Amino acid sequence: MSPTILSFSGVTVPAMPSSGSLSGNTYLRLIDTQCSTMRELKQIHASLIKTGLISDTVTASRVLAFCCASPSDMNYAYLVFTRINHKNPFVWNTIIRGFSRSSFPEMAISIFIDMLCSSPSVKPQRLTYPSVFKAYGRLGQARDGRQLHGMVIKEGLEDDSFIRNTMLHMYVTCGCLIEAWRIFLGMIGFDVVAWNSMIMGFAKCGLIDQAQNLFDEMPQRNGVSWNSMISGFVRNGRFKDALDMFREMQEKDVKPDGFTMVSLLNACAYLGASEQGRWIHEYIVRNRFELNSIVVTALIDMYCKCGCIEEGLNVFECAPKKQLSCWNSMILGLANNGFEERAMDLFSELERSGLEPDSVSFIGVLTACAHSGEVHRADEFFRLMKEKYMIEPSIKHYTLMVNVLGGAGLLEEAEALIKNMPVEEDTVIWSSLLSACRKIGNVEMAKRAAKCLKKLDPDETCGYVLLSNAYASYGLFEEAVEQRLLMKERQMEKEVGCSSIEVDFEVHEFISCGGTHPKSAEIYSLLDILNWDVSTIKSGFAELFDATTRIGFTYLAEK
C-alpha cells in the first residue's frame, strides 16, 4: 500500500503507511529541497516524531542542523538535541557551533564540557575546537581559552590552520595580544586571516601605528584587511586617516562593502564632513548597497551630527524597514540639534509603531528634555521607562536627569538624585552637577561636587578645570588660579583640544598649541591680526572675548 501524502503550507509530507516502515530518506530530501522556514521544519519534525523515524540519529541530526543555522532558533535546536539518544560527533559539533554564534555562547561551553564527560568513545574533533574558541572569545574568557589551547597542543592540532586562526582570534578579541602575537610568529607561510586578526587586535587595543605597519607589510590584502584598517582608524579617533585610506583603497581598485561604508560614515559624522558624507551616500545608492538597518542608522547619524537634520529625516522616512536603531538615531539627532519637541513627538510615534523603546530610546528623549529644560516631561519619561517598560536606568539616564534638574536651577534635587541613585556614580555625573553650579552660582555645592569628582579619579583634570572656571565666573580669581597651580604642581595636563573644518571637499583638523601645518606662520599671522581687531572693537562685543579666549584662539594649528 502506498503511503498517504499530507500537505502543510507548501511542504508535502508523507505520512506513515498502514503497514511496514517508511525510510527517512524522503524526509531528508524534503528538508534539503522544500523546507525553508522554521514553521515548515516543525511540521516535518512533528511527522518524524509521529512515525518514530526521529529515533534515527542521522535524521535527527539533519533536523538539528537546520535549526542551528539561525541563532534565533537555538531554543528549539536545544530541544531537538536533548531528544537525540545516540549523539555522534556531528550532533555535538552542530549544537556547539550553533550556540557559539547565538546570544548564549556560554551554552556552547557548557555543552562542550558535557561532551567531554559523556563517553570515552566521543572525543572533540578538529571541527569542535574552533566553535569553543569562538565562544570563549565572545565571553572574554581568555583564561579558560588558554586551557583549551593546552588541550589542542596535547592533541597535536596546534598547526591546524582553522584551529590556529580561531585560537588567535579568541586571544585578539580578549585583548591578549602577547599570546596572539606568539601564535602569529609561529605560523609557517602567509595566512591572510591571521594577519587580519592581528591588525584588528592592534587597532582594538589602541596600537593603530603597529596595525598600520603590519598592514603595510602584508604580501596580499583582501577587503577585510582594508576594512580592519579603516575601522581601526575610526576607533582610534583618526578619522581623516580613515577617509584617506578609502581613497587609497579606490586607487588600488579594491571593492568596498557595507562595513566599509558604515566606518566611513562614522568618520564623516565625527569630523562634521557633510560634503564627503553626501558623496558616500550617493556612492551607496549608485552601487546598490543593501540599505539594511546598520547602513541606514549610520546615514542618519552622519547627517544629524553634521547638522543636516532634514536630510537625516529624509533617510529615516525612506528607509525600507525602520529598525529600532534607526528610530533611536533620529530621536537623538533631533534632540541634539535644537528640535526637542520633534524628538519627543517621534518618540511617541515610536511607541505607536509597535516597536518597544529600549534604554537608548530613553537616552534620546531625555536628552531632548535636558536641552529644552522640561523638568515635568523628563520626570514622566523617567517613570515611564521604569514602570511601563521595566528598564532599569543606567548612569547615563541619571546624568541626563541631573542635567535637566541642574538646568532648571534645582541643584538640591540634582544632588539628592546622585546620592540616592542605585547605580555607581562616575565622574561624568559629578561634572554635570559642577557645570550646573557654575551657571547658577552655588559655590559650596560646586566645591562638594569637585571633591567627589577628584575622589573618583584623582588624575582627571576635569574637576580642577571646572572648579577653576566656576571660581572665575564668581569673580574669585585667586581661588581659580589656585586650582590651575595645583594642576601644574601635580603635572596634570588638560587633554589637547581638537576641531575640524571641511573646505572644498577636504577636511582640515586643528589641535591646540600645535605648529605642524606648512602654512603655520601665515595662520598665526592672520590670527594675530584678527585678535588685534577683536581687542580694538568698541562697546560690549569685545567683552565676549576674554583674555583666555584670545590667547587660546591663537594657538591652534592644523594636524
UniProtKB/Swiss-Prot annotation:
Sequence segments annotated as region (Type E motif): 429-504
Cited SUPFAM superfamilies: TPR-like
Transit peptide: 1-14
Region Type E(+) motif, annotated ranges: 505-535
GO cellular component: a single term: chloroplast
GO molecular function, one term: RNA binding
Keywords noted in UniProt: Chloroplast, Plastid, Repeat, Transit peptide
Compartments where located: Plastid, Chloroplast
PPR repeats: 88-122, 125-159, 160-190, 191-221, 222-256, 257-291, 292-322, 323-357, 358-388, 394-424
GO annotation terms (biological process): RNA modification
One protein family per Pfam: PPR
Coiled-coil ranges per UniProt: none
Alphabetical list of PANTHER family matching this protein: PENTATRICOPEPTIDE REPEAT-CONTAINING PROTEIN, PENTATRICOPEPTIDE REPEAT-CONTAINING PROTEIN ELI1, CHLOROPLASTIC-LIKE ISOFORM X2
Similarity annotation: Belongs to the PPR family. PCMP-E subfamily.
Protein name, entry field: Pentatricopeptide repeat-containing protein At2g42920, chloroplastic
Protein species of origin: Arabidopsis thaliana (Mouse-ear cress)
Gene field: PCMP-E75
